[in-house]
Amino acid sequence: MADTTPNGPQGAGAVQFMMTNKLDTAMWLSRLFTVYCSALFVLPLLGLHEAASFYQRALLANALTSALRLHQRLPHFQLSRAFLAQALLEDSCHYLLYSLIFVNSYPVTMSIFPVLLFSLLHAATYTKKVLDAKGSNSLPLLRSVLDKLSTNQQNILKFIACNEIFLMPATVFMLFSGQGSLLQPFIYYRFLTLRYSSRRNPYCRNLFNELRIVVEHIIMKPSCPLFVRRLCLQSIAFISRLAPTVA
C-alpha cells in the first residue's frame, strides 16, 4: 500500500507529485522567485534602479513564503494571545517579521543574504523530491549541485546567523546615517531575540556564544590594552543582559 500512496514520490510523475502537494509546490515556486529576485539585486545586471525593485520583490516573495509556511504549521488561526505566542515560536513567523522590517527600508545587501540562502536551501530540498518523483536517475548534473548545497548546509546556516547578528549594528548605523527609521533597530532587536530563542535553528545562539569566547580569548592576552579589555567586557556583559532566557 505504501508504494501507491499519492503523497509519496515513488511511482508518481513529477507533475502529479506537485499537484498532490499544492501548498509545498506554491512555497517552492515563491522560493525560486525569491532566489531569482535576490540574485538580480546582488548582481544588478538590469541596472541599479531595477535592482532596488528586485530587492523589494524578493522580500515580498519571502513574506508570502513565510506566511504560507506559518499557515502550514499553524492552520487554525485564532485571535488570541496563546496563538500569537505559539506563532512567535515558529521560524516562518520570524522571517515574515524580517521581511516586513526591511521591505520598505533602504536596500542593504547584507539583509538580502538570509532571504536568498534560506530560499535556496528549502527550494533545493523540494527540487530533490520533484526529481525523485520524475525518476531516480533524472537530471544527474542538477542532483550533483543540490547534493553540494546539502553538504554545505551547516556552513550556509552559520553564514545566515552571522548576517542576522551583524544586521543589528547595521540598523543602528542606518538610523544615524539617515537611511533607517527610528523604530527599525528596536523591531529588529525583537527579531534577533526570536532567532536567539529559536527551537529549530540554534545557529544564531551558538554563534553568539562562539563570538563571545573568541573576543574573551583575544582581550585576555597581555598585549591587549586595558581600556580595550574593559570596554569589551562591559559590552559583553551588556549584550548578555539583553539576551533572552532560553528554556
Curated annotation (Swiss-Prot):
One of its GO terms (biological process) is endoplasmic reticulum tubular network organization. Residues 53-100, 177-247 are cytoplasmic. Residues 2-31, 122-155 are lumenal. It is found in: Endoplasmic reticulum membrane; Melanosome; Nucleus envelope. It is a multi-pass membrane protein. Highly expressed in the liver and significantly in brain, lungs and kidneys. InterPro entries: PER33/POM33_regulator, TMEM33/Pom33. The modification N-acetylalanine is found at residue 2. The keyword Signal does not apply. The chain crosses the membrane at residues 32-52, 101-121, 156-176. Its main location: endoplasmic reticulum. GO terms for cellular component: endoplasmic reticulum; endoplasmic reticulum membrane; melanosome; nuclear envelope. Keywords: Acetylation, Endoplasmic reticulum, Immunity, Innate immunity, Membrane, Nucleus, Transmembrane, Transmembrane helix. Belongs to the PER33/POM33 family. Interacts with EIF2AK3. Interacts with ARL6IP1, isoform RTN1-A of RTN1, isoform RTN2-B of RTN2, isoform 3 of RTN3 and isoform 3 of RTN4. Interacts with RNF5. Interacts with RNF26. Interacts with PKD2. Acts as a regulator of the tubular endoplasmic reticulum (ER) network by modulating intracellular calcium homeostasis. Mechanistically, stimulates PKD2 calcium-dependent activity. Suppresses the RTN3/4-induced formation of the ER tubules. Positively regulates PERK-mediated and IRE1-mediated unfolded protein response signaling. Plays an essential role in VEGF-mediated release of Ca(2+) from ER stores during angiogenesis. Also plays a role in the modulation of innate immune signaling through the cGAS-STING pathway by interacting with RNF26. This is Transmembrane protein 33. It comes from Rattus norvegicus (Rat). The lineage of its organism: Eukaryota, Metazoa, Chordata, Craniata, Vertebrata.
